[in-house]
Amino acid sequence: MKKKVAIIGAGVSGLAAIRSCLEEGLEPTCFERSDDVGGLWKFSDHIEEGRASIYQSVFTNSSKEMMCFPDFPYPDDFPNFMHHSKLQEYITSFAKEKNLLKYIQFETPVTSINKCPNFSTTGKWEVTTEKHGKKETAVFDATMICSGHHIFPHVPKDSFPGLNRFKGKCFHSRDYKEPGIWKGKRVLVIGLGNSGCDIAAELSHVAQKVTISSRSGSWVMSRVWDDGYPWDMVVLTRFQTFLKNNLPTAISDWWYTRQMNARFKHENYGLVPLNRTLRKEPVFNDELPARILCGMVTIKPNVKEFTETSAVFEDGTMFEAIDCVIFATGYGYAYPFLDDSIIKSRNNEVTLYKGVFPPQLEKPTMAVIGLVQSLGATIPITDLQARWAAQVIKGTCTLPSVNDMMDDIDEKMGEKFKWYGNSTTIQTDYIVYMDELASFIGAKPNLLWLFLKDPRLAVEVFFGPCSPYQFRLVGPGKWSGARNAILTQWDRSLKPMKTRVVSKVQKSCSHFYSRLLRLLAVPVLLIALFLVLI
């Protein structure tokens, strides 16, 4: 008899989970509280309780070749960085193409998930849902939590003395939709993340004055990188990851800081992070530096206190006559339908083995998909997480002992502290993490074998973008089109921009080899510098 799996949420994580269950011969039932797939990317012009929310102008920060489902490339004419409506179109197309919609119960929120009385022997769960006021409970052999982590706003009001006296409007960035109503107003944005920078840059075109308050600063990256290519196709390579993790720390830190300052010197703009060498996820914004340069956005330190109409910053300066304060301060991790101790089993921190499995459960029949942050895209991560989880639920893969899993969590937390500091417990190193998950299911590319068998492909896999197709080259669920997708990914990235015929200066292959030479030159120079210094 097929094992029944309850999947909560029909965003990209939920769709990956449904598909993975079907690939492993499991029987999925997905519960989605809204009336459509897409999750975070399904735009609504109003705020819906219990659902993620985005603003009208949102574009992706990952490019199309790096954020697709591994066996389902985007159409050639799709732009590299998409408006949310184009991504929603792709997600819907994927769900239809893979015949996933029939496994989804829409407008059916999950109200509770509880262990069955005999959980210690069966690992089964009681899942209670509610539709049109009617509650139903069903028993499942396993559950996959795919409801995301952009639902419950984190607004640290206690950290801002006097905020209760402030007479202007005050709300979280989750409630922001479009800039028109703030025309001619004075706006303070608290937080220097992606949402805060997007909102501030957009508001600066209509507001009288926009100020961003940041406690610790941030690196601000452009989506456009070397030679005008998408940043992630140039930066997220196995070669660069190898250098980052194996060069001496001093050289690695110097190289990282140099990369971050390649576009502009952050110190001059008041943006430089307090700790410049931490690998916290940078902000992606192509417009913010220009808005600062034009005087339309001002960067300030943390707010010391509020008055009725103003904000006093820690440097003693003030922003007066404020009409609105927008808290772009992130989200909390919460699953109200689930016992909180399952996900946060220690010190109120997310405690999951490899970011997926609660280690303390008697049976490994619950998986959390998509509860990670990374410099890489979410879709390929959720695909690998779901494939691994489905194999564990089926019994094809097994997990280590509880002690071994907890030891691994402790080790990973130490590594995260080194690279990302103490503020981001769910951030991870993209390629290292993807390879780790892929190795569990036999989907990790064998580079040595590739260099012997298919040198052309091997060079692109190692030196080129670590695109999702790499994880469907081998193993269960391998895709026959993966090799061609990898070898033609640069062409697809250029296709939507070639709307005017120009004379060719050089062929794409010469571009590849020139890029390869530049990449090889950097570590040679760094190693030479290191040898001179010692």
UniProtKB/Swiss-Prot annotation:
UniProt-annotated binding residues for NADP(+): T60, N61, S195, G196, C197, D198
One of the record's GO molecular function terms: albendazole monooxygenase activity
Disulfide bonds: none
Binding site residues for FAD: G9, A10, G11, V12, S13, E32, L40, W41, N61, S62
Membrane spanning stretches: 514-534
Pfam families: FMO-like (PF00743)
Tissue-level expression: Liver.
Family listed: Belongs to the FMO family.
Functional description taken from the UniProt entry: Essential hepatic enzyme that catalyzes the oxygenation of a wide variety of nitrogen- and sulfur-containing compounds including drugs as well as dietary compounds. Plays an important role in the metabolism of trimethylamine (TMA), via the production of trimethylamine N-oxide (TMAO) metabolite. TMA is generated by the action of gut microbiota using dietary precursors such as choline, choline containing compounds, betaine or L-carnitine. By regulating TMAO concentration, FMO3 directly impacts both platelet responsiveness and rate of thrombus formation.
Name of the protein in its database record: Flavin-containing monooxygenase 3
Organism encoding this protein: Mus musculus (Mouse)
Lineage, broadest ranks: Eukaryota, Metazoa, Chordata, Craniata, Vertebrata
